[in-house]
Amino acid sequence: MSNIILSIESSLDCCSVAIYKNEYIHSLSEKCKKKHTTHILPMIKEILSQTKTEFKELNYVSFSKGPGNFTSIRIAASIAQSLSISLKIPIISVSTLAIMAEKTFRKYKQKDVIVAIHAKKKQVYWAKYTRNKNSIWIGEYTESLLEKKIIQEKIENLKKRWTLVSDQSELIEFQNILNVKKNYVFLPNAKDIIPFVLLKIKNKNKSFSIENNINYLYNQF
């Protein structure tokens, strides 16, 4: 029997959960700005019910580690850690920006992706990710918090054309740069955490701790 994986995503203004079971991904998603606390646990119970899964059957738990809002990331991290400890199962965290890159590939088959998340004032958290032939996203080392004008300069200096994705339409202002061929606005989804977890399981890269593994952006709430 294949592994059963629970994933949780609550880093921005949307809550989502997913279950990987019998090689199929089941997911739920809701917009829940400032109300993550009241949404996440009921959604987890609902997805378990829909998939006829009990907590004790879970083999792995995973969550989005940010960047994102302090409070909402902490909620997902705390739930994931509690499940990891109580069930004695590994916990795996994935970058929010990488999750958005994976969603871009799932929906649009784009492999060279610039991800931009609004931070505050004129700052943006950004990264450029490339999916290689082994389905691995390379680019977490590029994640940084920068001024918009600096990001524009970086994009203009890239040697190939990229797809731009963001959580807010105002950041699509970068679309007029010649190196940007397509642009999309959306929020991350828990179902796009699953491919990362499957790769880490395959490579035997797993952990039972979240220490030094969370990337807080700022406390919006």
UniProtKB/Swiss-Prot annotation:
Keywords, sorted A to Z: Cytoplasm, tRNA processing
Keyword set includes Cytoplasm: yes
InterPro entries the record matches: ATPase_NBD (IPR043129), Gcp-like_dom (IPR000905), T6A_TsaB (IPR022496)
Pfam families in alphabetical order: TsaD
Gene Ontology terms: cellular component: cytosol
Keyword check for Cytoplasm: yes
Highest taxon above the source species: Bacteria
Family listed: Belongs to the KAE1 / TsaD family. TsaB subfamily.
Function: Required for the formation of a threonylcarbamoyl group on adenosine at position 37 (t(6)A37) in tRNAs that read codons beginning with adenine. Is involved in the transfer of the threonylcarbamoyl moiety of threonylcarbamoyl-AMP (TC-AMP) to the N6 group of A37, together with TsaD and TsaE; this reaction does not require ATP in vitro. TsaB seems to play an indirect role in the t(6)A biosynthesis pathway, possibly in regulating the core enzymatic function of TsaD.
Listed name of the protein: tRNA threonylcarbamoyladenosine biosynthesis protein TsaB
Gene assigned in the entry: tsaB
